Amino acid sequence: MNKIMKNCLLGGLMAIAMHGLAQAEKADSTKPTMIEADQGTADDVKQTRTLTGNVILTRGTLMMKAGRALVTEDPQGYQFVTFWAKPGALATFRQKRDGPGDLWVEGEAERIEYDNKSEIAKLFSKAKLTRLDGRKPTDEVEGAFISYEGRKELFTGHNQDEGGSKPGGGRVKMVIQPGPAAPAPVPSP
């Protein structure tokens, strides 16, 4: 099999495997966005807010934490937030997923961009996403860049910090845990 065919097959398998790995709780989209920080500055003319020191954003079950954040708002009132980790740390997010049980998705990176209109989180540099059932990891993705689309139940990983992929530029790592074990067959009498 030639290299192009292998890359296409690998990309297709990766997209299929990642589809359904994460689904944001739908009720979160109707909740207000709350942001707390040690210090904040607002510019109503430019529709920007700058927050520094222990920044915490919550929206329903979504919680994002970082050292610094910049919030911009479009004319329709939707917010776009960029989070930067404090030195030596990573910015984080955690959100409940729809479905039965205690299902969550968690992510971390040096920078996270969150668009509350599209409900897309982009993780840049040292990016990691984990799907959890309670506290037990069920799936993990690591890479230089990860995009998490809550509405589409999709996340994708790339080997370049700004979202592209190139040969020799690093690897994306996925760990998919096995499903529950099938019950042992009942011996016939």
Residue ranges and their predicted role:
Residues 1-189:
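Mature-chain termini and adjacent capping regions
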